């Protein structure tokens, strides 16, 4: 899952970062590299806010010069969350289906928590979905979310 980001020099000599697909994800950095890394945090914060508000997290569609590549687990969590919303499945119902405690469900949906892929596979399976991972060649101007 990779989101396009827009970076422009701000009036106070910082770099302003916006995310077209997540308008509430706005950040800045003192340097271009710092701005790129801050974009990861801004995107994850926007995702968590949408979950808190029970809103769908939009799939990345915009194109741009720079991109933020999120961890595969984050993509799985977004897919799980959006599926839960679509199916009207709450956290408690997911916990019952998986025989999990509520903190396990909370961690499975927390984009900043390092969930195991096996737990995400299990959670997606009870919603009727499966997880597929592809390996892609690296391209210039990608920002690795792990570095943040």
State where each predicted segment sits.
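Short, charged, surface-exposed hinge/linker loops at domain edges
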Residues: 1-3, 40-103, 107-113
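A short, compositionally biased micro-patch
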Residues: 10, 20-22, 126
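Acidic/histidine-enriched, beta-strand-rich ligand/metal-binding domains
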Residues: 11, 17, 35, 48-49
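Beta-strand residues in well-ordered beta-sheet regions across diverse protein folds
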Residues: 18-20, 28, 134
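A short, exposed loop/beta-hairpin motif centered on an aromatic-Gly-Thr core
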Residues: 23-34
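DNA major-groove recognition helix of helix-turn-helix/homeodomain DNA-binding modules
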Residues: 118-134
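Short, charged recognition helix plus adjacent turn
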Residues: 134-148
């Amino acid at each position: 899952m990779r989101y396009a980001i827009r970076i422009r020099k701000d009036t106070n000599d910082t770099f302003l970062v916006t995310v077209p697909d997540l308008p509430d994800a706005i950040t800045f950095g003192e340097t271009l590299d710092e701005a790129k890394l801050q974009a990861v945090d801004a995107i994850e914060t926007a995702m968590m806010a949408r979950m808190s508000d029970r809103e769908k997290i939009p799939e990345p569609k915009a194109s741009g010069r720079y991109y933020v590549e999120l961890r595969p687990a984050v993509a799985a969590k977004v897919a799980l969350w959006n599926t839960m919303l679509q199916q009207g499945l709450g956290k408690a119902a997911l916990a019952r289906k998986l025989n999990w405690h509520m903190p396990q469900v909370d961690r499975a949906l927390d984009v900043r928590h390092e969930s195991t892929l096996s737990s995400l596979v299990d959670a997606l399976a009870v919603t009727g979905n499966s997880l597929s991972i592809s390996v892609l060649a690296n391209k210039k101007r990608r920002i690795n979310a792990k570095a943040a």
